[in-house]
């Protein structure tokens, strides 16, 4: 049985698009974008090597403030890219279908989350190590302290 750790990053004063593109450039772990509570999955970068910044902009422009279903978002991916590009997203969806963490509250402060899929998580120190890894990853993004868009990190474990 798998466990899922969802890291939520709180922003301060940056555009959602800029923050999302920063995710795509900076991390090699599973990614999840939330807008109006809608989970939006990206897999690790290899299957998405051909996804361009323009494509991401198109995807983001298609995500309106109106509530869309997860299938609506997947259809957007299909429309904008070759089906093979999103295959790993569909595989992830299959794995999460019965174990997705459910509704995630989205506020003005919460613009995204990173979904980390691991084996069973039983020891607190393993969770702490993963949180430290995420903090290190953010440090590598080389934001000046005053310009860093993230002001808090917390995690839900399911």
What name fits each language-model region?
Residues 1-149, 154-158:
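Acidic (Asp/Glu-rich) sequence patches and key acidic residues
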């Amino acid at each position: 049985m798998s466990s899922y750790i969802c890291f939520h990053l709180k922003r301060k004063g940056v555009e959602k698009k800029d923050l999302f593109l920063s995710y795509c450039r900076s991390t090699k772990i599973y990614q999840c974008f939330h807008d109006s509570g809608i989970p939006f999955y990206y897999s690790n970068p290899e299957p998405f090597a051909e996804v361009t910044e323009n494509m991401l902009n198109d995807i983001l422009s298609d995500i309106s403030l109106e509530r869309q279903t997860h299938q609506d978002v997947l259809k957007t991916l299909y429309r904008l890219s070759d089906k093979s590009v999103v295959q790993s997203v569909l595989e992830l969806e299959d794995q999460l279908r019965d174990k997705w963490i459910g509704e995630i509250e989205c506020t003005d402060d919460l613009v995204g989350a990173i979904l980390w899929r691991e084996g069973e998580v039983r020891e607190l120190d393993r969770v702490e190590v993963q949180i430290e890894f995420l903090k290190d990853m953010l440090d590598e993004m080389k934001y000046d302290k005053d310009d860093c868009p993230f002001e808090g990190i917390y995690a839900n474990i399911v």
